[in-house]
Structures are given as C-alpha cells and as structure tokens.
Amino acid sequence: MTKLELQYEGKSKQIYRTEDEGKVVIRFKDDATAFYNIKRAKIENKGKMNCAISSMLLGYLNSQGVATHYVEQVAADEQLCRVVEHIPLEIIVRNIIAGSMAKRLGLEEGLEPDNTIFDLCLRGDELGDPLINDHHAVALGLVSYDELAVIYEISAKT
C-alpha cells in the first residue's frame, strides 16, 4: 500500500491517504506531550514502541471479535488501517476505583465496585477532556443512545 499525501496531523500521529479510499496509513510520531499539550518533547523510538503496542492490542481485539480500524503493521512506526468516523469521546472502563475517580469522589483507591463503571470524556485539550454524561454526548450530536449502548457493550468486552 502506497502512502500518499498527509491528510491529518495530531500530537502523536500522522494520517496519510493511500490509493485505496477505504484505507489510510497511520504513522506514530516520536513527539510527547503532557498537561494537555503544555509540555512538549521528542522521545527517540517512541513512535515505534507505540506502534508495536497498538498493533499488538488492536490485533488481539480483532482476533477476539471486537472490530477495530486496524489492518496490519506495515513499518516499525506505521499501521495500515481502515477509514472510520472519529467520535471525540474517551470511554474509561473502571472495575477498580483508582486515579482521578478516587480523587474526584473522595474514595479509597483499590475498592472494587459491584458493577463496571464507565466514565465518558469529551476529547479535547482545549477543555481538558471534561467528564460528560450520556445525555451530553447525545445533545452534542456525537452519538445516539443506541450507539452509546453498543459502545458500552463493546467496551465491557475489552
């Protein structure tokens, strides 16, 4: 698959068109950011390591029947992927109370809730990836309630 012109560049990846309109090449960059893009640095081989880890995880999900955009790793820092619609949501699956959730709710880290907890965040450095609820996601036109149900079902499997 031939990598054509750059279609999109983010903080950690570049997306290139290919001759197949249904596929893109994703290149993982050596750039690192922290604190919502305030701190920046280059880390040698970061792109290669992130590509290898991503390829392993996405390949595993595909093998378990969880459809992803991933097709194959085509270079040390590149993947061939299917074109998909990007939904600017981050779904955090919690089976143990930890991190920001423990701090936000004043709970002890390590507690195991009786049910899986899904935190939904709106992706975007300018807002700091704020926590939102299902109704926000639907009202913003990001997803429908039916799509959210599928997202939660798939997230619970992984």
Each model region followed by its residue ranges:
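Active-site loop/lid in soluble adenylation, ligation, and acyl-transfer enzymes
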Residues: 2-120
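ATP-dependent phospho-/nucleotidyl transfer catalytic cores
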Residues: 80, 102-158
